[in-house]
Amino acid sequence: MKSHIESLLEQTIESFKNQGIVPADFQARIQVDRTKDKTHGDLATNLAMMLTKVAGKNPRELAQLIIDNLPPSSHVAKVEIAGPGFINFFIDDNALATQLEQALNDEHFGITLPEPQTIVVDYSSPNLAKEMHVGHLRSTIIGDSVVRALEFLGHKVIRQNHVGDWGTQFGMLLAYMEELRAANGEQAQLELSDLETFYRAAKLRFDESTDFATRARQLVVALQSGDEYCNKLWQEFNDISLSHCHDVYERLGVSLTRADVHGESAYNADLEQVVKDLDAKGLLSESNGAKVVFQEAFRTKEGEPLPVIIQKADGGYLYATSDLAAMRYRSKVLKADRALYFVDLRQALHFQQVFSLAKLAKFVRKDMQLEHNGFGTMNGEDGRPFKTRSGGVVKLVDLLDEANNRALELVRSKNPDMDEATLTEIARVVGISSVKYADLSKNRTSDYIFSFEQMLSFEGNTAPYLLYAYTRVAGIFKRAEDIDLTDAKIVLEHDKEKELATKLAQFGETLYKMTDKAQPNMLCNYLYELAGAFSSFYEACPVLAADTPAQQGSRLLLAKLTANTLNKGLSLLGIETLERM
């Protein structure tokens, strides 16, 4: 409905151009918002106040002109002027009911789909040769929820898991594997459970032994030169590490696959050309033997130019180099209209610099959008970054195990007579969903406190509350299996019916905002408000015990669309629903 009002206003602006009220080349930025007070209508715009200067008229006079020139619409019951020139729109109840009936019979819930784009989404991207830890959670699940919503809206989404599968740490790991095999023979194999221990032991050897460090550096050079032996060992590390990553993805319900992996090593052959092209464009400078690019817009607090280091004095490449190669690939080969990067907020300056440089060097098309969607940190209840009791990094699998165990205790306490298999399955869904939703429901850019007690609560904006809300709505239909809804129509008579209907109609605009801002918490907030609106409706408006069959059918349709919307919304967040809790 919001997009319909925007369309009416766009047509009105065109009419103003034809009448000479505004210049023919005038570009209006039309903004329509939901009203907080329903006595002021359902939707409102400040367009009249925005046009005051260009039209040379006072806002209330312009507001009346806008109303007089609005195309006729059966969706609008009335339009009023308020205050200094706000225009309030009251939506027709019958039009709203028709919109919801259409949503019930459409896989896209009656949402007008945008012009499809090709969108590259870079997310998760852990460093290999280590197990995933809690620091990987936010990028992985925030990115995945945005990906799901973009695909639902009809975009072509290309997932890119830009794993850290290259670099000096691999020389250290290869050297340690050599030592192990020299001592234990070729049968020395890496196991997934050994990966973290292996990495720490290799790092200790690197720090303590000059000879070992020298050998590690030699192996890096050999690996970068395409040495077959080194490449075989490197591939072994990557396979073990990726196997672990995808076990975690499967457990989290994340949609990334092996086919989405396009790590740093994929751009090795392009790095030298990146340097040559920057040099040919006259962008490279030398600083202490390193090849760098200075951009006027980036300076230190003291006013000194801030470089982007492209190649170190020893010939090595950096993250900026591979990021530039990746951006060129995503623009020229993948033909992306938009590229979204879900990386820690602490990398903001890095991305500002490389995005600017990619445009300056024409590595990406001028019209391609590059977006760093940064996020804050997940902290413990002491307000500090989440750690183990000993101060170590928390493995993601350990966090999920703990969530599962706590969820199992919770579900068992509420259902002491439930069979073990059902308890286990419900606990699995509740545990994983609680971890994901606790993160996704927070503003992406904020730090947040991780609390098992809060996330497993059945009160407030939590996964257990929403999962229960869904089962409550879906449960109505287990008692209504014999009711035929073929000829049922939605009729909005009670205030709580209208409030629920209005909230249901906002699903599409919520997804538009969520994908535009890359903010899953917008969808979480919407689903929480929808569950609340249904609860108020259910208390005030008997469904199965309605006064008439027509009223019963109408309310069942509202309940059905609520269940469908909750189910789809949670699915877009990567959260499974349950039919029983």
Curated annotation (Swiss-Prot):
It is an enzyme of class 6 (ligase). Pfam families: Arg_tRNA_synt_N, DALR_1, tRNA-synt_1d. A motif ('HIGH' region) lies at residues 126-136. GO terms for cellular component: cytoplasm. PROSITE patterns: AA_TRNA_LIGASE_I. It is found in: Cytoplasm. Its EC number is 6.1.1.19. GO terms for molecular function: arginine-tRNA ligase activity; ATP binding. PANTHER family: ARGININE--TRNA LIGASE, CYTOPLASMIC (PTHR11956:SF5), ARGINYL-TRNA SYNTHETASE (PTHR11956). Monomer. Belongs to the class-I aminoacyl-tRNA synthetase family. This is Arginine--tRNA ligase. The gene is argS.
